[in-house]
Structure formats: structure tokens, C-alpha cells
Amino acid sequence: MTLPQIAIGFGAAILIPYMNVFFKYQFNITDSLLGLLFSISSLLIGIGSILAPRLSVVLGGKIRAVVVTQMISLVFLLLMGFALFLWLSSVGYLLRTALMNMSAPLYSAFCMERTPEQHHGLVNSVLSLAWNIGWAVGPFVSGVVQQRYGFKPLFVATAILYAVASILTWAFFRHTEGMPELPQPTLFQSPEYPE
């Protein structure tokens, strides 16, 4: 469960915190337009989070939905980084953000379904640690790359890391779709495990 989170965390850490710098550097965007872009992005994240459970039903499972949304988001990530026009890069940013963030609640829910209740806190902590490993190193790496080469290598590296995370998620968990969730004990009884 943690390897995909490490890859996504590092991929995000080298690029996502610097979107304001990227848009300023690449397109000389005004602060008010940048603020509007980020506001719309937050709104789309909320809408995507609401739609994600329905998407997992349509696609036949949480893992399928996680992998599909992450892989499609790669197209828009690269569009954002390599577009020649602000409007096209902005569309890429908005769609990448919505799609990539749709997968997070689904992956978290999947992990909790596969974990006995008494271990939920530990699993959440480990997933958070895995995500933050990338954020501990990523900003330094990003700063060095930005100074020497600009943003384009960071977009490529992030796309590769996100793709690796999606492939790992699919490889590790595709066979668990459709399996029953772990039974959870109720207040007065122990769980009954199938034999």
C-alpha cells in the first residue's frame, strides 16, 4: 500500500507546490487570474471527490477507478507542462488536478476496507508517512532542477512517478477487486471470518 504513495508523494512534491511559480514564469500570469485558476481548481477537487464513489461503481471497483483517473491525468499533466498557450495549460492544470485528486479518497477507502479496524490508525499513519517521504526530499530536488533546467524535466519526472504509482497499484491490487471486505466487529461481537 505504501510504494504507490511514495511515488505519488515524491512526484507531487517536486512540482505541485510550484504551480504559481510555473504559471508566472511560463506565462507571466497576473495574480488575480492565478487566484481564479486555483479557486476553480479547488472547486473541481470537491466535485471530483463527490463523483469518485460513483465512478468506482461504473468502472467496477475502487482500484480500477484509481488507476484510470491517475493514468488519464497524466495526459493533462503533460499538456499543462508543454502547452504553448495559457488557456491550454490552464485546462490541463484543472483537469489534471480534478482527476488526480479523485483517486485519493478511493485509495484511502480501499486501504481501510482491506485493513482490520484495530489497525486503521496504524495504516493511515504509514500511508501518511509514505506520502510525506517525498515531500521531505522533493522541494530540494525541485529547486535544483528548476534553477538548472526549468520546469519541463519536472513535468516529465512527475508523469513517470505517477505512472509508476498507477502501475504498482494495479499490479498489487487488481486481483482484490470483488473480494469481500474484511468483516468488522460490532460493538458486542467479534467478526466472523469465512473459512
Language-model-detected regions and their locations in the chain:
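Short amphipathic helix-loop junctions that connect adjacent transmembrane helices
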Residues: 17-33
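Loop-to-transmembrane helix entry/capping segments in MFS-fold secondary transporters
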Residues: 31-32, 117-127
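Helix-to-loop junctions at the C-terminal end of transmembrane segments
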Residues: 48-61, 146-147
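Structural signature of the two symmetry-related core transmembrane helices
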Residues: 64-79, 156-159
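Helix-loop junctions at membrane interfaces in 12-TM secondary transporters
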Residues: 81-93
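Intracellular juxtamembrane helix-capping segments at the cytosolic ends
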Residues: 102-115
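A membrane-interface helix-boundary motif in multi-pass transporters
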Residues: 144-162
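Multi-pass alpha-helical transporter architecture, strongest
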Residues: 158-190
